[in-house]
């Protein structure tokens, strides 16, 4: 239990120092969270310079908007939300966010049960291979934990479109899993 308290204390001290614009605290914050946040960026943008740019832009926003963090929730969660929003803005700017509203009605449980047999790296590759719209909604819903209403607002789409994109993503993942005989 001391480790958890210690980690929370360190995080709180980092936040306070970042609010004072302490460069060493900003560097420590970057080092502490950059790996996890790069994984978030890659989930939406793939590996490459765009993900790296979004990571850097996201951290710039973290440090310039740190005064808005109210310390009631998780600092990591707050940073993650900024990274997701930055990734979505980059996708919009690139003109890559296209959604179609069709429901295929795949059974959720079938796909999720199959995931349990895969290694994380294999699953990430399958998710990465999805079309951009499907991948984006799948990541927001299944990995980040947003609901369809929140996703619709974030992406500027109808709630039904979010649901159908998730259904299509799960359907494609199921097909890919079947090919792997999972």
Language-model features and meaning:
Residues 84, 88, 143, 155-179:
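DNA-recognition helix of helix-turn-helix
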Residues 67-71, 81-101, 116:
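Arg/Lys-rich amphipathic alpha helix in sigma70-family domain 2
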Residues 9, 125-136, 144-161:
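Helix-turn-helix DNA-binding module
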Residues 30-48, 65, 127, 178-179:
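Amphipathic, Lys/Arg- and hydrophobic-enriched alpha-helical face
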Residues 1-8, 17, 125, 139, ...:
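C-terminal edge and immediately downstream basic/flexible tail or linker adjoining helix-turn-helix-like DNA-binding
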Residues 19-20, 43-46, 56-74, 93-94:
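Sigma70-family region 2
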Residues 39, 53-60, 73-85:
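Structural recognition of an alpha-helix C-terminal capping motif at a helix-to-coil junction
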Residues 15-39:
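A short, charge-rich alpha-helical start-of-domain segment used by transcription regulators
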